[in-house]
Amino acid sequence: MSQEDSTSAAAAQQPTSRPAPKLNERILSSLSRRGGGAHPWHDLEIGPGAPAVFNVVVEITKGSKVKYELDKKTGLIKVDRVLYSSVVYPHNYGFIPRTLCEDNDPMDVLVLMQEPVIPGSFLRARAIGLMPMIDQGEKDDKIIAVCADDPEYRHYSTSVSLLPRLQEIKRLEDYKKNENKEVAVDAFLPATTAREAIQYSMDLYAQYILQSLRQ
């Protein structure tokens, strides 16, 4: 089978309900970086229990006004900006390794737990829901999870019983508005939808790994 036929066959197997992101230079540069230390997006395992239980790399600490994010080229956590006003991140925030979403980034996760976690650390989390978000016209959904090793939170399997705390998460909309950015947060979706979204992002990542190896 020719390379063109192989590409066409792979495209035919993609889910038609969601558009696939283009394999851009930002992704390719991080995929090709193998000369230095481990890259948290590509080298850390997602975990054997995924999509239900999975590893999360923490980018932003609970209670922080500093927005950190992964530098995709180096694999380091960099400072992006400091939030406006008194808005802080209500929970630890990070991403799931070896996943890929339509915005060309790994899947975002908010992790509910008792303590703040240092940026660059990773932990085990369990999906309990999904927060649909539109950020400046683009889909930017967030997985809502609990720390699987926190005795205060690990028994939760659905977001319904955590609704009061989840309202804090919707304040993410506030900090965007303070920066004159249009963002909309819809009603929380159940854990089954979250697991489906994670599985889709895992499949999309695997597809692009294969594609990058052909180039």
UniProtKB/Swiss-Prot annotation:
What top-tier enzyme class does this entry carry? hydrolase
The coenzyme or cofactor needed here is: Mg(2+)
User: What tissue specificity is annotated for this entry?
Assistant: Expressed in metabolically active tissue such as root, shoot, embryo and aleurone.
Q: Cite the record's Low complexity compositional bias ranges.
A: 1-21
Keywords for this protein: Cytoplasm, Hydrolase, Magnesium, Metal-binding
Entry GO terms, CC: cytosol
**What processes does the entry annotate via GO biological process terms?**
phosphate-containing compound metabolic process
Q: Using the UniProt annotation, give all residue ranges assigned to the region (Disordered).
A: 1-24
Could you say which residues bind Mg(2+) 2 here? 108
Quote the InterPro entries the UniProt record gives: Pyrophosphatase, Pyrophosphatase_sf
EC no. given is 3.6.1.1
Q: Which reaction does it catalyse?
A: diphosphate + H2O = 2 phosphate + H(+)
Q: Which residues bind Mg(2+) 1?
A: 103, 108, 140
Q: What does this protein do?
A: May play a role in germination.
PANTHER family xrefs? INORGANIC PYROPHOSPHATASE (PTHR10286)
- UniProt similarity note: Belongs to the PPase family.
Which protein are we looking at? Answer: Soluble inorganic pyrophosphatase
The source organism is: Hordeum vulgare subsp. vulgare
